[in-house]
């Protein structure tokens, strides 16, 4: 990497606890669930509920789930995000490359400050959310915009999303093909995306349309017809209605209709994390097995070279 470069790429992921412990999970969830982009309930009502009820309950529960998927190097989300950044330095030798988290460490603002201290004058921000949402990408943009107001001398370009980027679509399709070549092909492929409340979509969030675009393009790259794949939304939280169809009940219904073998991929996640490894790969598989069906999870792109190359291309095209 050219350490005299005045151009940088900062990739940003959601975040993760620093350890699979109740205390670390409470700290992380406390920050995450305090973001008004994520939870829009008035703080007067939400903060007491969050700190007196939700965090004391979810902290220990989530910690036990994180422990199931924790790697020797740390949280999967953190490990794979760091590896992507390391891979990007090979594709962008004249750039500085850094990584940050929206919640937790390494903190986004601190990463921006560090780049400025290195005399960087142009920064491309790449949120690792393929499909734009006001609950994810826009939250990153909020922090970046606030930082830019006090650092006007740095030119910042923020990539909105890459839901239909040809190189990214090709990378996802190729990973599915490799899985089929190694394990055979199932009867049905599910594209499972993280859900969000239906009211958010009703207020104009384009996320469900972006998910549909991604799934359709990947299916087309695989030459699948409409009967061979299905889209679902996972990770519902709370009692209100979220985007439908819900992924797990959809799989159950398909199993009850006679389908016995499923493949599942999560194209809304750039790297594997709690939701993909514990909720989906372990959880969905167990509940389907109880219904006489099997599900094979296809990992996220993680630090796949084709993924890294696609992200490098996005960064290069982002600058005027």
Swiss-Prot record:
Fe cation binds at residues 194, 275. GO terms for molecular function: ferrochelatase activity; metal ion binding. Its EC number is 4.98.1.1. GO terms for biological process: heme biosynthetic process. Pathway: Porphyrin-containing compound metabolism; protoheme biosynthesis; protoheme from protoporphyrin-IX: step 1/1. It catalyses: heme b + 2 H(+) = protoporphyrin IX + Fe(2+). PANTHER family: FERROCHELATASE, FERROCHELATASE, MITOCHONDRIAL. Belongs to the ferrochelatase family. This is Ferrochelatase. It comes from Xylella fastidiosa (strain Temecula1 / ATCC 700964). The lineage of its organism: Bacteria, Pseudomonadati, Pseudomonadota, Gammaproteobacteria, Lysobacterales. The gene is hemH.
């Amino acid at each position: 990497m050219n350490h005299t470069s005045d151009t940088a790429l900062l990739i940003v992921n959601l975040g993760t606890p620093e350890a699979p412990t109740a205390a670390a999970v409470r700290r992380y969830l406390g920050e995450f669930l305090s973001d008004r982009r994520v939870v829009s309930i008035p703080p007067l009502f939400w903060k007491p509920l969050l700190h007196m009820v939700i965090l004391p309950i979810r902290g220990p529960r989530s910690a036990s789930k994180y422990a199931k998927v924790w790697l020797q190097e740390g949280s999967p989300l953190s490990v794979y995000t760091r590896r992507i950044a390391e891979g990007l330095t090979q594709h962008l030798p004249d750039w500085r490359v850094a990584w940050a988290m929206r919640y937790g460490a390494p903190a986004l603002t601190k990463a921006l400050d560090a780049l400025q201290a290195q005399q960087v004058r142009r920064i491309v921000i790449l949120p690792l959310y393929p499909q734009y949402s006001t609950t994810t990408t826009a939250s990153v943009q909020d922090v970046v915009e606030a930082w830019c107001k006090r650092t006007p001398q740095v030119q910042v370009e923020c990539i909105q999303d890459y839901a239909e980027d040809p190189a990214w679509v090709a990378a996802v399709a190729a990973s599915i093909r490799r899985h089929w070549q190694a394990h055979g092909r199932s009867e049905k492929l599910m594209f499972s995306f993280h859900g969000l409340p239906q009211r958010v979509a009703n207020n104009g969030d384009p996320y469900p349309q972006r998910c549909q675009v991604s799934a359709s393009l990947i299916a087309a790259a695989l030459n699948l017809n409409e009967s061979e794949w299905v889209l679902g939304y996972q990770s519902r939280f709370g009692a209100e209605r979220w985007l439908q169809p819900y992924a797990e009940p959809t799989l159950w219904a398909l199993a009850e209709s006679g389908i016995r073998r499923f493949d599942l991929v999560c194209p809304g996640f750039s790297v594997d994390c709690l939701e993909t490894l514990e909720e989906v790969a372990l959880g969905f598989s167990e509940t389907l097995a109880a219904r006489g069906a099997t599900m094979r999870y296809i990992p996220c792109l993680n630090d796949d070279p084709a993924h890294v190359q696609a992200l490098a291309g996005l960064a290069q095209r982002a600058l005027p």
